[in-house]
Amino acid sequence: MYKNFVWFVQDLYGTRDFIPLHAPRFIGNEKKYLIETIESTFVSSVGEFVDRFELSVAEYTGAKYAIATVNGTSALHIALILAGVQKDHEVITQSLTFVATCNAIRYCGGTPVFVDVDKATLGLSAKSLEDFLQEHAEIRNDGLCWNNGSNKIISACLPMH
């Protein structure tokens, strides 16, 4: 199965060579900005560049505010809190995902519920989600989505790339 998956991904990217997860790409002022950041002594979660980044994201998205987070897990955690995920709630996500997805759900006290991925995209399958919701979920009189099998609230759906 492992070899089949690797071949599938290699075919998708049109190569049998190593496919890096993250390849750095420097195309402009990165070195200059890194030196400025180091010299400012603000190299972590605060400083001029963080402030500028947050303002740029807010402006670009049309949001009133934007915040930079330390990593993707903390960003997902905040998003789930804002979505109303609480202890004993369920969150639908895909079966092929990074551990951060489930960690963020558990940090809120929730439980991940897995649906299958789309073979063409490796993202959450809309068909699998539709099938799951039709078979297992209902909107009750309280206006919330409930899993009939577990009798728990489904408070979010978290598709990942």
Segments predicted by a language model, with ranges:
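N-terminal "arm"/small-domain region of PLP-dependent enzymes with the aminotransferase-like
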Residues: 1-43
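Phosphate-binding glycine-rich loop
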Residues: 46-90, 104-106, 114-116, 138-150
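A short beta-strand submotif of the Rossmann-like class I SAM-dependent methyltransferase core
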Residues: 68, 93, 156-160
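Short beta->alpha hinge that forms the Motif I/post-I loop of the SAM-binding pocket
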Residues: 96, 117
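Conserved coil-to-alpha-helix start sites within the AMP-binding
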Residues: 97-101
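Structured binding elements
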Residues: 109
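Active-site phosphate-binding strand-loop segment of PLP-dependent enzymes
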Residues: 120-161
